[in-house]
A protein has these predicted regions:
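Acidic/histidine-rich alpha-helical segments that form the ligand environment
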Residues: 117-157
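Amphipathic alpha-helical hairpins
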Residues: 63-73
């Protein structure tokens, strides 16, 4: 990790968020003498960033209206494409823990085994990642078969959100060490 979190700064950041449900697990880890995973530790170096992450998470992931399985598919697809070790490995563990797939990497790569809805979402995501200025009307039309306008907005935001987290983790050398393994 390229950023070295300071213990006192971490404790203060998490104490300020002690009542927040999203950080319940992290606060339990701290009480037990354990540390939070590196992404949260890194974000806690700026309490503003940690609060922003919390707000986005509450509304988009794990919050939001899209099915959790679809969210994990989107997260894994972006994370693999962006070579984000933290997000890829942690969401492989999360996907296994939720019982979504025993082989999450195949879950993403074997697209012909996915339903039409998931295939449309991944095609849209791939188009955004390739060049967000060139998403075709055909891709949008295919998406509209399965998603409402509101869901398309949420899906687009989720795609941007996970890409931002991938870039954050990659740039700062944040690594996953199995903290979320089932």
């Amino acid at each position: 990790m390229r950023i070295k979190p300071e213990t006192e700064q971490l404790k203060q950041a998490f104490q300020n968020l002690a009542e927040n449900e999203s950080f319940k697990e992290t606060n339990e880890r701290l009480k037990n003498g354990e540390e939070p995973h590196d992404m949260v530790k890194t974000m806690a170096m700026s309490e503003h960033v940690l609060k922003a992450m919390l707000a986005l998470g509450d509304e988009v992931y794990p919050g939001g209206s899209l099915p959790r399985q679809l969210k994990e598919l989107i997260i894994l697809n972006s994370s693999i494409q962006n070579s984000c070790q933290f997000c890829t490995k942690s969401h492989i563990d999360i996907t296994k823990g939720l019982g979504i797939s025993d082989d999450p990497e195949a879950f993403v790569s074997e697209r012909d085994k996915l339903n039409d809805c998931d295939q449309a979402a991944l095609a849209y995501q791939d188009a955004i990642i390739a060049d967000s200025n060139r998403v075709s009307q055909e891709t949008i039309s295919r998406l509209r078969i399965h998603f409402s306008e509101s869901e398309i907005v949420e899906l687009t935001f989720l795609i941007g959100y996970i890409n931002m987290l991938n870039w954050f983790n990659n740039a700062l050398g944040v690594e996953y060490r199995g903290e979320l393994a089932p």
